[in-house]
Amino acid sequence: METSEELKQRIGDLSYEVTQHAATESPFTGEYDDFFEKGIYVDIVSGEVLFSSLDKFNSGCGWPAFSKPIENRMVINHDDSSYGMRRVEVKSREAGSHLGHVFSDGPKEAGGLRYCINSAALKFIPYEQMEKEGYAQWLTLFDET
């Protein structure tokens, strides 16, 4: 099993603070905020599949925004009252990584949710690399596009 120090070395200081200590990267600074390539987003810690580029939208909030996870079972939501706010925190199911928060101000036509996710918690797998990286079963997500 990987130690905290090994994990920090593998994913970097910011990703470690975000995923392990629920830190938040500064708005408009994340690698995937203004990024709309075709592919999937996985947990930077565990590699578990989380979001698809098909569900990503520009919310203007300063962080990557998704209307939904690829499958609801892939994330865990729970109430977060830190910093005097009432929010719903989003974590990855397997690794328990802090990803961000979900809000009810997303596109109505896509279900009304906005998953506001830290870039530092994610790793993007380009569509062309999905099979090589071990994510071939998710290629069918893009069959109709």
Curated annotation (Swiss-Prot):
It comes from the Bacteria. The active site is at 116 (nucleophile). Residues 4-127 form the MsrB domain. Keywords: Oxidoreductase. Its EC number is 1.8.4.12. One of its GO terms (cellular component) is cytoplasm. It catalyses: L-methionyl-[protein] + [thioredoxin]-disulfide + H2O = L-methionyl-(R)-S-oxide-[protein] + [thioredoxin]-dithiol. GO terms for molecular function: peptide-methionine (R)-S-oxide reductase activity. Disulfide bonds: none annotated. GO terms for biological process: protein repair; response to oxidative stress. Coiled coil: none annotated. Belongs to the MsrB Met sulfoxide reductase family. This is Peptide methionine sulfoxide reductase MsrB.
